[in-house]
């Protein structure tokens, strides 16, 4: 089977994915212990960003690894209806067509959203396929499909029956542009420059005034108290008195509360319970009235004096300040830096707003969810995220689950004309249960928070409330892979809901990864113009197309110039096509536990070269083994060389390191171990060491067979070991190498084993670890490297065969020389190797050391004397520093007394070694000086 000369990912990736999907390789096998991962459902109409690609690579690596270990593997896929995000996209589309949702009406608007979902809902799933995600597409779910909608209604009704869902007036984050409550996650706190106004509030009895400070003067019209600290001596006598609230002309009490910081400002705080979260809590503690002064558009309503009604909040602020100033009640204005809450989608300032909403009472649900992590039923990786989880869970507010949107799960509650509320799975059930006959009913207009349905994700996708085979087999799931930013919004709620409805944890482990940032460590965002599209890494993109992508549809068009300039600087030639495998390997190499990762184009470039390296290694192996006797499935005699035994031994260590790292979610360590073994040991050394055996006349047929067998079997194991990281290139090569290594026939027979995906992941065999071979191979490599270094430093042409002398060697060195003379001569390009006894004198030479043994390259006619003096001087300087460091360490009583004896002894041995090497190099330097 001929392999293409060069590796071209675009020629193999998509066809392999289609092949795997059509063959059903992503489905659970039905054999082995179950292993299940639930994909965090991306927005149905969204597209894949670097964070998704990073997360999906981690999940796919785990899934492919466990599948190869024989587990009954399910990676459950699905998408989220993403209420607010999807509704906004469709509303923008309608605005472009000159209409809006209110003109269309609810039903027609929802038809439009479903239409939009059908049109663009496939983007993210197509992109997931491009990433190589081996999810079971036959089980794909959507948070608003019939089954999941049924589960949502079931959960709502059951929680309501138990009194755990209720309707009440509470303060929420209100988006005045979108006219809905939004979650904390959808609020961005932006640092902005503003003012702090200091006003005088007159005492009702006319005896003086208090000074209060605020950044939001317009809200003073809703004040219902002024608070001071109970221990503040300045105001002790005032507690219980009242203030005449200016402009509103009503009396409000002066109250004492620990919330007040007596050292901030005047130590007096205006309390507006209906428009500030902290004030709301103070208001509840003191039973204060809650006066909502805003409309849903954030204009002032009829609760304020007539002159302010209908003004928007910005106009109202100016009028309030002017009016108080005119009354002589404005004391001063300071510049002030403030954190302004803005809606992450609308960009407008969010209002704390008092409104009727549906809530989940979380206290009872939180207790078992805390216990599950405390007792180890659920473990966070890294463990420090458990503390973040606990701090949230122990300070939970009831969860506002209603949203004033049209797209989403409509709340299953109906109202009669008297305002009575009836909750049920559908209207029919409500009428029957409450004997309502044909009483007119209207359903609640609100929909549920998107996080409500996604909190049921692990069990609803497997068929709950029915008791299905899938639920019994795959629940609880094994691991959740998620970003830290949604531990509270999603992870905690999944744990609460799943424990409540299944008596099981949703997953046994939570692997928390960091954010993917740009090369400067900045968060990627459209407004910064630093977003990278994973598909552009795979397929490549021109500079012009990249600039166009980054500047199109900017919220702040003034940033276009700056973004263009930056893109020109970072990607002067656009982005090369690197292929999926190089992208995945880059993500994994950067995935150190829990930390944010800085994207590095140098890395992906390097890993594209790594793909080429593997490809070229496979071509070399194929050329030298195909059609030859590889000693597999035959009785022919096979003899292994030192290099063969060494690489087999090194493979066992690499397999163990990769498996242990994957088992502990250290994807960076696993990918590094695979890379080091494949590039440095197999490609750079073993392939070179195989050439003398395969191409030389000094070796027997049995030895040639041994090397051919080792070449193919180790390469085949490498492909299986690297497959979870790099699925496409490994499958392509395995189809050609597998049969040579005695594995399954190439694809096309329709057998389950016709793919590397279902081959066993290589397991380390301790019996194959050969320390003698490892010692010998390291010696051979060290001698070859030493000669090559001298060649490079002395500028000796590569083609020139050299004589070398070995001096001061031990018997073990002599034995290794005798056994490996051919390797050394061929790979170091030597014309002769002379062993010198202690009595023999050596010619003036360039010197390198392997242990205590000196490698001498005679200099006559070869060497640049000045360059060699400089080289040796540098080596000597380096060794002197090491001697000084070791001496300092051994003179330090803290080290000598406290370190284990073995560590101290090791340091002493190192010092002796450094001194011995130093003496030899100094002697050599003197020789050269007198040449």
Curated annotation (Swiss-Prot):
Keywords: Aminoacyl-tRNA synthetase, ATP-binding, Coiled coil, Cytoplasm, Ligase, Nucleotide-binding, Protein biosynthesis. It holds the Pfam family Val_tRNA-synt_C. ATP binds at residue 526. GO terms for cellular component: cytosol. The keyword Lipid biosynthesis does not apply. A motif ('HIGH' region) lies at residues 42-52. A motif ('KMSKS' region) lies at residues 523-527. It is found in: Cytoplasm. The keyword Ubl conjugation does not apply. Belongs to the class-I aminoacyl-tRNA synthetase family. ValS type 1 subfamily. Catalyzes the attachment of valine to tRNA(Val). As ValRS can inadvertently accommodate and process structurally similar amino acids such as threonine, to avoid such errors, it has a 'posttransfer' editing activity that hydrolyzes mischarged Thr-tRNA(Val) in a tRNA-dependent manner. This is Valine--tRNA ligase. It comes from Alcanivorax borkumensis (strain ATCC 700651 / DSM 11573 / NCIMB 13689 / SK2). The lineage of its organism: Bacteria, Pseudomonadati, Pseudomonadota, Gammaproteobacteria, Oceanospirillales. The gene is valS.
């Amino acid at each position: 089977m001929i392999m293409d000369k060069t590796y071209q990912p675009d020629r193999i990736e998509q066809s392999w994915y289609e092949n795997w999907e059509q063959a059903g390789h992503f489905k659970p096998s039905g054999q082995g212990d179950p292993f299940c991962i639930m994909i965090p459902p991306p927005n149905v109409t969204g597209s894949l960003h670097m964070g998704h690609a990073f997360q999906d690579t981690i999940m796919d690596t785990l899934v492919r690894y466990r599948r190869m270990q024989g587990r009954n593997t399910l990676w459950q896929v699905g998408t989220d209806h993403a209420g607010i995000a999807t509704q906004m996209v469709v509303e923008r589309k309608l605005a472009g067509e000159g209409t809006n949702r209110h003109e269309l009406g609810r039903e027609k608007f929802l038809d439009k959203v479903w239409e939009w979902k059908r049109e663009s809902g496939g983007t993210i799933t197509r992109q997931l396929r491009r990433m190589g995600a081996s999810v079971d597409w036959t089980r794909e779910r959507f948070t608003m499909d019939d089954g999941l909608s049924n589960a949502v209604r079931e959960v709502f009704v059951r929680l309501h029956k138990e009194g755990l869902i209720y309707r009440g007036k509470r303060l929420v984050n209100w988006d005045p542009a979108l006219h809905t409550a939004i979650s904390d996650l959808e609020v961005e706190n932006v640092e902005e420059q503003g003012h702090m106004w200091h006003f005088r509030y007159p005492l009702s009895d006319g005896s003086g005034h208090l000074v209060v400070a605020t950044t939001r003067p317009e809200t003073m019209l809703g004040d219902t108290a002024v608070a001071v600290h109970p221990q503040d001596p300045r105001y002790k006598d005032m507690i219980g008195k009242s203030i005449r609230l200016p402009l509103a002309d009503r009396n409000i009490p002066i109250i004492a509360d620990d919330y007040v910081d007596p050292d901030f400002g005047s130590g007096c705080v205006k309390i507006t319970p209906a428009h500030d979260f902290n004030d709301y809590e103070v208001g509840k503690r003191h039973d204060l009235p809650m006066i909502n002064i805003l409309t849903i558009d954030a204009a002032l309503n009829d609760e304020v004096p007539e002159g302010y009604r209908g003004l928007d909040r910005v106009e109202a602020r100016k009028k309030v300040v002017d009016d108080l100033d005119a009354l002589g009640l404005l004391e001063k204005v300071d510049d002030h830096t403030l954190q302004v809450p803005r809606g992450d989608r609308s960009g407008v300032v969010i209002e704390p707003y008092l409104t009727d909403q549906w809530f989940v009472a979380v206290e009872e649900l939180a207790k078992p969810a805390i216990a599950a992590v405390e007792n180890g039923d659920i473990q966070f990786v890294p463990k420090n995220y458990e503390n973040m989880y606990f701090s949230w869970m122990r300070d939970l507010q009831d969860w506002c689950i209603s949203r004033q949107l049209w797209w989403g799960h409509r709340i299953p509650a109906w109202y009669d004309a008297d305002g009575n509320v009836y909750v049920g799975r559908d209207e029919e059930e409500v009428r029957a249960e409450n004997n309502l006959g044909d009483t007119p009913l209207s359903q609640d207009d609100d929909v549920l928070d998107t996080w409500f349905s996604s909190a049921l994700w692990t069990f609803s996708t497997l068929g709950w409330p029915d008791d299905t085979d899938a639920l019994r087999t795959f629940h609880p799931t094994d691991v959740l892979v998620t970003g830290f930013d949604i531990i509270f919004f999603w992870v905690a709620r999944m744990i609460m809901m799943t424990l409540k409805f299944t008596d099981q944890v949703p997953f046994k482990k939570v692997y928390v990864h960091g954010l993917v940032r740009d090369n400067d460590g900045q968060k990627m965002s459209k407004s910064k113009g630093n977003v990278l599209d994973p598909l552009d890494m795979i397929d490549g993109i021109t500079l012009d197309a990249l600039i166009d992508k980054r500047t199109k549809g900017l919220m702040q068009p003034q940033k276009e110039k700056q973004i263009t300039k930056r893109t020109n600087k970072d990607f002067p030639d656009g982005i090369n096509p690197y292929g999926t495998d190089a992208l995945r390997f880059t993500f994994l190499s950067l995935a150190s536990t829990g930390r944010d990762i800085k994207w590095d184009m140098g890395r992906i470039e390097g890993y594209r070269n790594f793909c080429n390296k593997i490809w070229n290694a496979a071509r070399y192996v194929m050329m030298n083994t195909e059609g030859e006797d590889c000693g597999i499935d035959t009785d022919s005699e096979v003899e292994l060389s030192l290099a063969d035994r060494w690489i087999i031994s090194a493979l066992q260590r690499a397999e163990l390191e990769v498996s242990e790292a994957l088992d502990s979610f250290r994807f960076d360590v696993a990918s590094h171990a695979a890379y080091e073994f494949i590039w440095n040991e197999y490609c750079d050394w073993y392939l070179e060491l195989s050439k003398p055996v395969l191409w030389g006349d000094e070796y027997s047929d049995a030895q040639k067979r041994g090397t051919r067998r080792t070449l193919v079997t180790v390469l085949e194991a490498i492909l299986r070991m690297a497959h979870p990281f790099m699925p496409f290139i490994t499958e392509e090569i395995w189809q050609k190498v597998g049969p040579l290594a005695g594995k399954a026939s190439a694809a096309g027979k329709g057998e389950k084993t016709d793919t590397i995906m279902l081959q066993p992941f290589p397991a380390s065999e301790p019996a194959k670890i050969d320390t003698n071979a490892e010692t010998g191979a390291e010696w051979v490599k060290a001698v070859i490297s030493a000669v090559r270094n001298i060649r490079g430093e002395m500028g000796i042409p590569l083609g020139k065969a050299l004589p070398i002398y070995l001096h001061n060697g031990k018997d073990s060195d002599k034995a290794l020389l005798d056994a490996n003379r051919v390797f050394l001569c061929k790979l170091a390009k030597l014309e002769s190797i002379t062993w010198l006894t202690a009595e023999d004198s050596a010619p003036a030479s360039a010197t390198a050391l392997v242990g205590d043994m000196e490698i001498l390259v005679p200099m006559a006619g070869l060497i640049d004397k000045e360059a060699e003096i400089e080289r040796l001087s540098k080596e000597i300087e380096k060794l002197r520093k090491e001697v000084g460091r070791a001496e300092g360490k051994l003179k330090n009583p803290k080290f000598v007394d406290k370190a284990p004896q073995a560590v101290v002894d090791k340091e002493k041995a190192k010092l002796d070694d450094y001194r011995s090497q130093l003496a030899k190099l100094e002697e050599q330097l003197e020789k050269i000086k007198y040449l």
